[in-house]
UniProtKB/Swiss-Prot annotation:
Catalyzes the formation of methylglyoxal from dihydroxyacetone phosphate. This is Methylglyoxal synthase. One of its GO terms (cellular component) is cytosol. HAMAP family: Methylglyoxal_synth. The gene is mgsA. It comes from Clostridium perfringens (strain ATCC 13124 / DSM 756 / JCM 1290 / NCIMB 6125 / NCTC 8237 / Type A).
Length: 119
């Protein structure tokens, strides 16, 4: 299974903790991430992560293309709902594509934990 990991700046620490908590499970899957999220996960775990561009520089769109091409099976996107994002249209497009292609999507740590418990 290919799993995409994305976290807004204020959610990066939560993503690191999630990756640590589920490191054993995640290690059995192919991981892709936006640039900084992937780097931080790799720096804090033993997980191998293929890094796309940073979200604001096109990384969300890269992962959206993977969703549209059936090249990713699950997306964990820890969003910061209290901070405006300059690339909000890209984020909305990615979320829409997950719905269109019925790709499981977690946008907070609790929903991510529920999904991770099942992989």
């Amino acid at each position: 299974m290919k799993i995409a990991l994305i976290a807004h700046d204020k959610k990066k620490e939560e993503m690191i903790e999630l990756a640590k908590d589920f490191e054993d499970k995640l290690s059995k899957h192919i991981l892709v991430a936006t640039g900084t999220t992937g780097l931080k996960v790799m720096q804090n775990t033993s997980l191998d992560v293929k890094r796309c561009k940073s979200g604001p520089l096109g990384g969300d769109q890269e992962i959206g293309a993977m969703v549209a091409n059936h090249d990713v099976d699950m997306v964990i996107f820890l969003r910061d709902p209290l901070t405006a994002q300059p690339h909000e249209p890209d984020i909305s497009a990615l979320l829409r594509l997950c719905d269109v292609y019925k790709v499981p999507l977690a946008t907070n740590t609790e929903s991510a934990k529920l999904i991770m418990a099942d992989i």
